[in-house]
Amino acid sequence: MEWIDPYLGYDIQVSVNSKKVVDELLERRICGVAHGKAEFGPRALGNRSLLGDPRYDIKDTVNTIKRRQKFRPFAPAILEEYKDEYFEGPMNEYMQFVAKAKHDHSSVTHVDGTARVQVVKKDCGSIIRPILEEWYERTGCPMLLNTSLNLTSYFDFILYM
């Protein structure tokens, strides 16, 4: 059996308007994105993700939405061409390594200043790439908070949106 990619399941093919997603993020809202096939594994890679503005402390809001403990870490999704400006150490598109943040980004790093960085390549094929490009164009920030879109219920998601 050959491993093709980290995606499986139902393939959601809906139009995602990157501009509208970024409009919501700029209002300091947390945005849910569901597009393409679901990721298989422990990390959100952009096809089933909650996204947030990493420039502000939004951890408590996301923890409330997800009903999870405060100590649980978040991760940044960053445009590949900017990863070395913000982090040092091994990084890849599957968040398999821990990198050290070069600057304070407390919304997307652990208490020790490290993060499991998702490097978003130009050819990744995920909706997260055009969202990040729009985000960078409008803010100058090449990353977003990215956590898995696994909520207790549909109501929780609507309640906090």
Language model feature labels by segment:
Residues 1-161:
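Flexible beta->alpha loop and helix N-cap segments adjacent to enzyme active/binding sites
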